[in-house]
Amino acid sequence: MLEVSNLTAIRDERVLFENLQFEIKPGELVQIEGRNGTGKTTLLRIVTGLGDRDEGAIKWKGEAIEKSRDQFHQDLLFLGHQTGVKRELTAFENLRFYQSIHNSDSSSERIFHALTQVGLAGREDVPVAQLSAGQQRRVALARLWLSHQILWILDEPLTAIDKQGVKVLESLFSNHVDNGGIVILTTHQDMFTDSPKLRKIKLGD
């Protein structure tokens, strides 16, 4: 379980949010909503431990994330605005590298499957530097198919993804929460209309 209590973030003397409280349990899909500038990305970065908070506490499995940093990071997959892919490596090599550092199943078949799911079949051996920005984003998203982490925190994962790609990702998110995972994301696109699986947390009200 992820617990956020009395969370406050102030940037440039402007309060983005204060005394924010919520709990997210395994099997939940949560969308963070709000206008631009309300602190959605800031919230995700704070929850992952990458951003500073002014007040409040964040716990994972009952422990403050500062005290259980190693376990928390083992359980976390974060995809932010930066893709985090290595431009000098190919798409395939990037995912192989990801497998090696996360002790994932190292089968080549899983990598090919992941790249197919994000529409990069046939581009496996192309250096990432030669891919478009949207394709580089898809290489990063392909990690989701290789992930064993429980907690997925995703900042605008649907950017530059077509309708079919959105459906594929929605199915992946559903399967992840059905298997006891947690997905927290921001997006400007409509998702899971009226789905009981989707819970929304709105910032800026």
Curated annotation (Swiss-Prot):
Q: Can you quote a single GO CC term?
A: plasma membrane
- From the UniProt record, list the reaction(s) this protein catalyses: heme b(in) + ATP + H2O = heme b(out) + ADP + phosphate + H(+)
Q: Where do the ABC transporter domain residues begin and end?
A: 2-204
Q: Where does ATP bind?
A: G34, R35, N36, G37, T38, G39, K40, T41
Q: EC?
A: 7.6.2.5
Q: Fill in the subunit field for this protein.
A: The complex is composed of two ATP-binding proteins (CcmA) and two transmembrane proteins (CcmB).
Q: What is this protein called?
A: Cytochrome c biogenesis ATP-binding export protein CcmA
Native organism? Vibrio vulnificus (strain CMCP6)
The organism's lineage is: Bacteria, Pseudomonadati, Pseudomonadota, Gammaproteobacteria, Vibrionales
What gene makes this protein? ccmA
